[in-house]
């Protein structure tokens, strides 16, 4: 399962940061920390839903209680690692003022990266970019953390939303080879890499060896038994 995968990846590669994903639950964080025991560079990625829909129907909770749980999870993860990422699940449908409160609280608790997921793939690019910009302008201490994009492709907007996030201040993007992911998939690594390479005016260097994109795409497709559509962009 995921636990053994993280262990084996940690043993096999030493240069990248290896990140283990958890819910904002102490026992989950304990397991994530154990899975990272062989990693040279460790990160725990914990989080909780922040939209009113998630708060009411998934957690039967309140906005204030969600902030408390978020802060507690980050502080608990910091017992194990210095590098802690927090995700605000369904941030795409979370009201901006409340989202800013959550982000500010988890940064104060020690989060080094804050992930702003468009969990349902609902946002338009202008809307998602404006959300990132709002956080950049309204969160005290935003300079102490990196904002990350995490976009789903349910409406075919994942790559556009990710680029919009970058243009408005995000400095980490969560992407997948060939855009693989649940439902309609996640943001395509190869699309973002080539957009940033071709549009020099954005002035962001990913340090990706783009000559390796095509063979990597084919390898992932073969290993996962997921054919790439013939007219897929880039690959």
Positions of predicted regions on the chain:
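Short glycine/serine/threonine-rich phosphate/pyrophosphate-binding segments
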Residues: 2, 28, 154-160
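Alpha/beta enzyme core
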Residues: 4-13, 26-147, 163-170
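Active-site cofactor/substrate anionic-group-binding motifs, chiefly glycine-
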Residues: 13-23
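Short beta-alpha connecting loops at secondary-structure transitions
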Residues: 15, 118-119, 174-182, 197-206
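A short, small-residue-rich loop immediately preceding and capping a beta-strand
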Residues: 19-20, 145-151, 168-177
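Structural motif
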Residues: 21, 87-89, 117, 150-152, ...
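Flexible glycine/proline-rich, aromatic-decorated loop/lid segments
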Residues: 40-41, 157-173, 180-198
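A mid-to-C-terminal "edge-of-domain" accessory segment
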Residues: 196, 200-235
């Amino acid at each position: 399962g995921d636990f053994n995968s993280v262990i084996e990846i940690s043993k096999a590669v030493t240069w990248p940061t290896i990140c283990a994903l958890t819910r904002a639950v102490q026992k989950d964080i304990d397991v994530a920390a154990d899975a990272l025991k062989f990693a040279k560079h460790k990160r725990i990625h914990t989080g909780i839903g922040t939209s009113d829909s998630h708060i009411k129907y998934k957690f039967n909770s309140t906005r204030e209680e969600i902030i408390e749980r978020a802060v507690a999870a980050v502080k608990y993860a910091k017992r194990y690692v210095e590098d802690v990422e927090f995700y605000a699940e369904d941030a795409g449908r979370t009201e901006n003022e409340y989202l800013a409160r959550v982000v500010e609280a988890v940064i104060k608790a020690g989060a080094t990266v804050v992930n702003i997921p468009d969990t349902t793939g609902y946002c338009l690019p202008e809307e998602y970019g404006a959300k990132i910009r709002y956080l950049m302008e309204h969160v005290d201490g935003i300079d102490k953390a990196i904002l990350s994009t995490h976009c789903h492709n349910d409406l075919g907007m994942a790559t556009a939303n990710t680029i919009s996030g970058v243009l408005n201040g995000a400095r980490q993007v969560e992407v997948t080879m060939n855009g693989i992911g649940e439902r309609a998939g996640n943001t395509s690594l190869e699309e973002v890499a080539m957009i940033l390479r071709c549009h020099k005016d954005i002035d962001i260097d990913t340090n990706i060896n783009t000559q390796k994109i095509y063979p990597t795409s084919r390898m992932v497709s073969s290993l996962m038994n997921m054919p790439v559509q013939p007219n897929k962009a880039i690959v």
